[in-house]
Amino acid sequence: MLIRIVRMTFREDKVDDFLEIFNNSKNKIRHFEGCHFLELLRDLDAPHVFMTHSHWETEQALETYRQSELFKTTWAATKVLFADKPMAFSSRVFVKINE
């Protein structure tokens, strides 16, 4: 399982535009083949900073999504709203602690 976190900083006047894009695409992304989890996080101290947190079956599943029309159109509409360059992190669970 691959865990993907993308940190995005938006122009403050474009946050509502981003939220509309996300709300219109979130179910399509979540149900894209290979995606098992999706959530949107908002920074506590900077409300114009968001992170998507998603789980993908494999690196290839994520790459297939990144090459899809869904990603291309969603990303094209989103990236014009940025105030700063986004940061993306791909990880795997290294140690998991259960109670």
Regions found by a protein language model. Give the residues of each.
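Short, well-ordered beta-strand segments in beta-rich or mixed alpha/beta enzyme
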Residues: L2-T9, E39-R66
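Residues within well-formed alpha-helices
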Residues: I5, N24, M51-H53, T73, ...
